[in-house]
């Protein structure tokens, strides 16, 4: 396996930030990239989904104190492609359309974003100090603009809404869920609008992010494109 340090020995511990809208394939690409480079894959979107799931379970009110307590009392662990939230394995539970919608909703609160920013930075620092990985590949909203603005390289992955909706439709059908394409497309467009227009940390590419449009590219082609950019780091 080619490690990041064999690509550029000038970076002792790399941080790669991958951002982009919902349903664009960030999770799969980030996981493949981390495996290829010997880094830890951190799905920050899943961290927000864990909060959204607990929010749903506890019926937590929408005030700062309650949300702060929710954030501080939520313990998230990622290991072996599984996600644990306060001792409950939630890998599949947090992938429902309902939790997805709640995740977008809860992420609009500044108090939640501040807590999650701290949790994400602490996670990466723990990984750095452990020496277990060559670096970290972080995927999710605001990674390159807010959480790690000094990341070694930033990607903003995008694709046409119709193509993203089709991918999501196929994914849910494979899981045996009864879904309608038009409903998924409408929900995706609504989430795009909310994410791009929200007042707190809107979805925008970092000024120095590399834009990757996956609309007409296969998975391996996208991965190779990203690796070529990484090899050019000086």
Name each model-derived stretch.
Residues 29:
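Hydrophobic positions on the alpha1 helix immediately C-terminal to the Walker A/P-loop
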Residues 4-10, 85-91, 169-177, 194-234:
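NTP-dependent small-molecule kinase module
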Residues 161-169, 181, 185, 189, ...:
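An amphipathic alpha-helix signature
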Residues 26:
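Conserved lysine of the Walker
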Residues 91-175:
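ATP-dependent NMP and nucleoside kinases share a basic, alpha-helical "lid"
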Residues 16-18:
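Hydrophobic anchor at the beta1->P-loop junction of P-loop NTPases
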Residues 21:
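P-loop (Walker A) phosphate-binding loop of NTP-binding proteins
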Residues 35-97:
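N-terminal phosphate/diphosphate-binding loop that engages ATP/GTP or pyrophosphate donors
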């Amino acid at each position: 396996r080619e490690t990041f340090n064999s690509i550029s020995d000038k970076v002792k511990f790399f941080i790669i930030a991958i951002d982009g809208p919902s349903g664009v394939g960030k999770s799969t690409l980030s996981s493949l990239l981390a495996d290829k480079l010997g880094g830890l894959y951190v799905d920050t979107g899943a961290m927000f989904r864990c909060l959204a799931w607990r929010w749903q379970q506890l019926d937590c009110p929408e005030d700062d104190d309650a949300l702060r307590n929710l954030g501080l009392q939520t313990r998230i662990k990622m290991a072996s492609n599984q996600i644990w939230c306060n001792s409950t394995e939630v890998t599949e539970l947090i992938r429902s359309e309902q939790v997805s919608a709640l995740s977008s909703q809860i992420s609009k609160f500044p108090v939640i974003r501040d807590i999650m920013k701290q949790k994400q930075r602490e996670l990466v620092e723990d990984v750095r100090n452990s020496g277990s990985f060559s670096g970290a590949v972080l995927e999710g909203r605001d990674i390159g603009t807010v959480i790690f603005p000094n990341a070694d390289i930033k990607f903003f992955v995008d694709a046409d809404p119709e193509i993203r909706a089709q991918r999501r439709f196929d994914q849910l059908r494979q899981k045996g869920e009864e879904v309608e394409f038009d409903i998924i497309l409408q929900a995706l467009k609504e989430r795009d609008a909310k994410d791009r227009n929200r007042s707190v940390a809107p979805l925008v590419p970092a000024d120095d992010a590399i834009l990757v449009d996956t609309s007409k590219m296969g998975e391996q082609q996208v991965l190779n494109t990203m690796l070529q950019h990484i090899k050019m780091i000086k």
